[in-house]
């Protein structure tokens, strides 16, 4: 069995992330570690409570636990594994959609994502459904 050299974990609710963000995260991780070193790079959520991206090498170097308030426990877990975590602050990865406030932040940010297009479509349908002419 061959062990994975590294593992990148991203949640599915970060609609602003782009390929360049992933490349930048990989570059930050490589720069912080050097080839073959054990390393842990994390991108916190905008409120610094959650963990919105983790790049770990080797893949199983640090046990992961996601959910509410996972950022600080992930930092502590890396340190318990004798790895000093690298924190990368990346705004497009930092914004996840967990609450209505997160959704408002997303809608306030300029973007042309599929998520935004779908939300705009839903908003128009809701507006049409609630208009006086639609309710008769």
Model regions and ranges:
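Phosphate-binding/catalytic loops
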Residues: 54-65, 89-93
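Short, high-confidence coil segments that cap the C-terminus of an alpha-helix
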Residues: 3-4, 37-40, 83
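Short aromatic/hydrophobic "clamp" motif used to bind/position activated sugar donors
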Residues: 7
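Conserved catalytic core of nucleotide-sugar-dependent glycosyltransferases
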Residues: 37-60, 69-70
């Amino acid at each position: 069995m061959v062990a994975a050299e590294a593992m990148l974990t991203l949640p599915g609710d970060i609609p602003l992330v782009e390929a360049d963000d992933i490349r930048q995260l990989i570059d930050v991780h490589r720069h912080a570690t050097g080839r073959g070193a054990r390393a842990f790079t994390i991108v916190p959520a905008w409120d610094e409570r959650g963990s919105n991206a983790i790049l770990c090498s080797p893949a199983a170097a640090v046990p992961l636990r996601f959910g509410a308030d996972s950022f600080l426990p992930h930092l502590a877990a890396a340190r318990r594994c004798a790895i000093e975590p690298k924190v990368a602050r990346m705004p497009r990865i930092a914004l996840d959609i967990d609450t209505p406030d997160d959704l408002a932040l997303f809608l306030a940010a300029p973007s042309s994502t599929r998520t935004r297009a779908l939300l705009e479509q839903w908003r128009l349908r809701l507006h049409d459904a609630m208009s006086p002419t639609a309710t008769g």
